[in-house]
Every structure is written in structure tokens, then in C-alpha cells.
Amino acid sequence: MEWPNPVTLATANLAIIDTSVYIDNLRSRRFEKELLGLQFIVRCSAVVLAELSGGARSREMSRFVDTMAKNLRIIAPNEREWVESGKIVARLVAAKGYDIHKAREIHFDVLIALTARRMGAYLITCDASDFIAIRDLVGFNLICW
């Protein structure tokens, strides 16, 4: 796990937690210690909320999503980020040969990354390969667990 140094934290103390971290933690409590020890102010991506809501298969998961929506500041991609995200997905498809299903899946990740970049926030994920591919095209702060 790669943590930013304290000087960086003083200037960029916001974080967006990716869907993959929430899902892994809900299933196995894998990141419980890391989440409780975060030295960031967490902002919730509207895209992450949508992914979690769409995948909620239990009452516990639905309650978790509702609690997040009530208690965290929600941030959403703006119009420019939506337009830019399509261009980035097209570049990823051309470079990596993604099929239509992978292109749709990674489109959400691109939107999350662009929102994090605009805010100067760290994006925390356990889906390293996709976000590293995105970061190769778009600079943003990334922490992979």
C-alpha cells in the first residue's frame, strides 16, 4: 500500500473511495482497518453511489448506500467531464482492444477519475489495473490497495 507523504496530505486531503473498495470491504471487511485510519476527508462520487445502488442485492447493502448518500458530500461529474470521458474511453478501447462490455464498465471508472482530478482528490481503489490504464492518459492522484 502506497501512502502519500504528510506534506502531500496537507495540500490534498480529499479522497474518493472507488466502488471496488466498498464492495470488497462489505464482503470480507478486508479494508476495515485502512478505512477507519484514513487521513482524508472522504467525498462520495455520484458514480460510485450509482454503481453500489445498481448492485445492491441485500437490505444491508441498500441501507449502506442510503447512509452514504445522507452522510457524505456527493460529487458528480460535470458536463465537460462527461464529454472528455467518452474521448478517453475511445482511446482506451483503441489502445487496449476492450470489447463493448469492458468499454461500458471502464467508462464509470473514467468518470470517477476525472472527478477526482478536478477536486485534487486521491482516488482509492483495489482495481489497480483499470485505474492505472486511465492514469496513463489522464493525470490524477491514485492509491491502490
Please identify what each model-predicted range represents.
Residues 49, 62, 82-89, 109:
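A general structural signal for well-ordered alpha-helical segments in protein cores
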Residues 73-101:
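Acidic catalytic patch
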